């Protein structure tokens, strides 16, 4: 949620007139729920709304909190979310699209040019691959095959996966794997 905070706040500003009138926990609940609606496709919208309303009902000391949460999230889930690409000012548009402060957007564009800065902005949302160091090099091949990992091109005892979870494996529990970036293994 933190990585997309500026974007989420911009979207919420389209449906909430005065953020300062909301209790901080209500605003945070709306941010978290909006994140689920916008970026997590495995959770149905109705479930996000129901869960948020239940939290507001249990947490809130006023009746209005649950009604507000319900209304805002139903509105957001029933129509396309606002599109930041329609923002006319370039720095503001990139700020909202990539959830970066305007001052940083300006600085990177001034320093690297718009094309290079845009590549930097886009790289912030590329998911890193998972990498581990195998503590017993004699079992490297076996562990690679079992976990579906590839051998590292940088480290002779490293394994990498584009997605996955090494920490849940028996190898990790037995101490045969250490979560470590490839470059740290050199």
PLM regions with names:
Residues 1-40, 133-134, 153-167, 171-185:
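Conserved AdoMet
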Residues 2-97:
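Accessory substrate-recognition/RNA-binding modules or partner subunits associated with SAM-dependent
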Residues 79-186:
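Glycine-rich nucleotide cofactor-binding entry segment
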């Amino acid at each position: 949620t933190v990585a997309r905070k500026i974007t989420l706040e911009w979207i919420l500003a389209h449906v909430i007139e005065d953020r300062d009138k909301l209790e901080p926990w209500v605003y945070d609940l709306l941010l978290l729920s909006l994140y689920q609606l916008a970026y997590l496709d495995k959770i149905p919208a109705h479930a996000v709304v129901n869960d948020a309303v239940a939290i507001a009902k249990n947490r809130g000391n006023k009746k209005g909190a649950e009604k507000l949460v319900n209304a805002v999230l139903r509105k957001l889930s029933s129509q396309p979310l606002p599109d930041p690409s329609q923002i006319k000012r370039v720095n503001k548009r990139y700020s909202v699209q990539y959830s970066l402060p305007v001052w940083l957007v300006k600085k990177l564009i001034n320093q690297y040019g718009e094309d290079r800065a845009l590549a930097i902005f886009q790289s912030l949302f590329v998911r890193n691959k998972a990498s581990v160091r195998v503590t017993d090099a004699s079992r490297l091949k076996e562990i690679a095959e079992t976990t579906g990992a590839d051998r590292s091109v940088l480290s002779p005892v490293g394994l990498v996966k584009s997605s996955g979870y090494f920490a849940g494996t028996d190898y990790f529990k037995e101490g045969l794997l250490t979560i470590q970036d490839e470059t740290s293994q050199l």
